[in-house]
Amino acid sequence: DIHGQLRDLLLLFKGFGCPDSANGVTFVFNGDFIDRGCHQLEVLGILLALKVMMPDKVWLIRGNHEDRAMNEKYGFKLACFSRLGHKFGERFFDVAQQVFEYLPLACLVSNRILVLHGGIGKGTWTLDDLRKLSLPLKESAMQPWIYNIMWSDPIEDGEEGLFGVHESPRGVQTSTFAWDVTKMFCARNGLSLVIRSHQSKMDSRGFDIMHEHMLLRIFSARDYEGHGNDGAVALLQDSPKEENMIKVRLQVLRSTTKAREEARIRDEAAKLKDGKGVTSKLH
């Protein structure tokens, strides 16, 4: 998730290189490019321009915020109107919705790693079911299993005794799924790992490794809605030592809120060490 946070998008390019650079990096952006952030139009414009220029180097996955109803509620429509005026803002907003309907719901990396925005829901669908979907895909035509790809969440590993599929607080159509569902889904589809996004966790490090190392949560927007969370990026590389092996390296994007607080604490500690700490008067 980027959620209109331009600084985090530019930080990714600074740290890993641009898609057209000599290092040959391919980027997968896992949905929720817009809503809530301060630079939604800039982020969307950059991503779409890169996709047009380098279609094999930039992949855009549809998230639950690539949706008209969500955009009308959580800020993208307002951003279009306030930045572009009513006439051009409305036109840009409508064109963006048409683009979203053509975005894929997932991508497959090296035939072993599935990247999707939300989750697997009941996990009874297959990769072939995904391949058979025709675009454009309107929300009104979405079956529950499709809807859950953008909306469902995993059950935390610490919640012992929970197996299978359960109702989600997100809504009637949405499910939560336990580790056994992930395990069976991966086995049925020949997968080693599912990478998903969708959830920001307050004060988190930006990623979670779950469900017996078969599920990875990645959330890239730092300090999302003031949560003080780190962001994270997953770097996938072929192993030079082992054939058909992919290394997954996780890079944390440090929360600026945390960094400032830690700097303040270090500064105060240094003052105390030098005898320059704040003194209080006792009465």
Each predicted region: which residue ranges?
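Feature recognizes metal-dependent phosphohydrolase scaffolds
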Residues: 2-283
